[in-house]
Structures are given as C-alpha cells and as structure tokens.
Amino acid sequence: MVTDMCANYEPIAKNRIHLLDLFEPTFDYKADIFPNYSSPLLFAKAGNIEWRLARFGLVAPWVKDIKQVKNTYNARIETVASKPSFKNAWKKNQFCLIPVETIFEPKYIDGKAHWYGIYRTDGMPFTVAGIYEYAVVNGEEIRSMSMLTINVDTHPFLNQFHAPEDEKRSVVVIPPSRRNAWLHVTHDEAPDFLVEMPIDEYTAAPKNEMNKFRSNTH
C-alpha cells in the first residue's frame, strides 16, 4: 500500500531561525502545520535567498477550483516528474527548503497509531527538500509547496513508522552544506540530493510528551 510520509510538522520557531544563520521572516505562522495551512519556506530569487509563506499542499497552475486540490502535500520522487500536479514545478526547477523543528508520524503499537515526533538529537532545526508553485485561482494568488519523499523500507530508524503493511516513506533533509546548492539545483541534478536521513542524527518521542523537553521550540 502507498502512503504519504509527512502530513503534520512543527515549522521552525521564529526565535530559533538564527540557528540556521538566516534572518527572521516578517510574517507570522502557526506552530503546528497540517495540509492547507500556511507555512514558511525558503527559495532563491535573483541570487538571493528569500522567505515566503506558502500553502502546505501544492496547487498547480492549471487548477481552476481549490477544492480540486487533494493530497498534494507530499511528492514522490519516483513520479514527481510525470504527475500533473507536480511536473511543472519539477521541470522549472522550483526547489525550496522547508525549515522545521519536528516531523510527526504514526507509530503502530498493539495495532493502534501513536503519534511520534522525529527531531534532531542535537536539538537543532533542520531543512526539508520541497518544490514550490505559484498559481492564480479565481483571482487569488496562491503560493504553495510540497515535501519530496523517498522510499525508506530498509531504513533501520524510519521504517518503524506507519502501518506495518504500508510502504515506508520519508521526507528528505538537506544538510547545511548543501542548502544553497539545493535552491539552485536543476531537476536533472536534484536526485543526487535526495538521500536518507543519517541514522545517528535523529530520534523520536511521543508527540504528547514532547513539550516536556522541547519547550524551547515554540
């Protein structure tokens, strides 16, 4: 069975953006992001890196009714170049970074889903690879994005999430040394960046317990 990896995450806290050596955006945003919410992203424009607020769930330029847009918050790397919703952004090299504190995923224990947060062991925020799009729907300008995902069936840490019978998927983390390159990459070069998370750099904990030891994020 095919499943999406990330439908809920905690974006980077504004008071921690300096940890990425970035300037703070001028807009506000929610501390817990779900599909169709607006969230911050980074993209390159005229050689500069800029912040934008974007809808979590990509809206293709051909969309006439926003109600048509469903399940576009994750883009599978295996099909991103051919899927109607994503192929324009991919072929036009519209790559972005989504700075986050935590990714939330279900872990099944005794047949029941328990939500866990995946975060860096050193407590630092990190940046997720995405594609972005610009569309005008019924006269409204919409900037949107999707997180790229890869298969992680054999990843010893990430394969514990989602239902046992489901394919295991993961977002892609772009490390600090490759962030600028990712924002200027071509779609032919992009697959070289889409690799699994380093096993020893991430851990997980139940979502309902995380505020006990990660209260510094939001």
Q: What does each model-identified segment do?
A:
Residues 1-218:
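Short linear sequence motif anchored by a di-proline
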